[in-house]
A protein has these predicted regions:
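Histidine-centered, transition-metal-coordinating active-site segments
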Residues: 1-173
């Protein structure tokens, strides 16, 4: 919780009014922010596998090795018959893992709801849930995407285009 963004001094009155209206204590985060944070992490970390596959960065072998390294090979059960169609394989794997992660994270949230409401819970709900191993798998797989030259070139090009557009618009004012 402490690493999350706060508010500007100029917003202090608004912040205090929100805290009072929601019945939160001091620096306690709203309980739903824990679920929102987890859902965001699950959605983006797992979707990276599809992007990596489409770019030819993440292969079936890499997927199997990474799941095995993190002691999660059971997640691949039932998908073997789709190995000849990697687009479908990766899509089904994403759906299966996202569903499992959402269920396990929600279960952990419900288990810790009193700590969360009281402001005694100061961690990411996904990290402490039974879904943390799967999260680690997808975080490791995403590293291959972000260190790949194709991805880096695309990001650099995007940055150049945005800089050009912003400079053009700024100078037009």
């Amino acid at each position: 919780s402490q690493k999350k963004y706060g508010y500007f001094t100029s917003e202090k009155e608004d912040y205090n009014r929100i805290i009072e209206t929601l019945g939160l204590k001091g620096k306690t985060r709203h309980p739903l922010t824990f679920l929102l944070e987890a859902a965001d992490d699950i959605a983006y970390s797992v979707s990276d596998i599809e992007d990596g596959h489409k770019l030819g960065i993440i292969t079936l072998d890499r997927i199997k090795r990474t799941f095995s390294t993190h002691d999660c090979p059971g997640e691949l059960v039932g998908l073997k018959k789709y190995e000849s169609n990697m687009d479908l394989y990766v899509r089904l794997l994403r759906i299966k893992c996202q569903s499992k992660m959402l269920i396990k994270t929600t279960k952990e949230y419900n288990r810790r709801i009193n700590e969360i409401i009281e402001g005694d819970f100061d961690s990411e709900i996904l990290k402490v849930s039974e879904a943390s191993k799967l999260r680690d798998v997808f975080k490791e797989l995403s590293v291959y995407n972000f260190s790949n030259i194709k991805v880096l070139k695309c990001e650099l090009l995007g940055q150049e285009v945005l800089s050009y557009l912003l400079n053009t618009f700024y100078n037009a004012l």
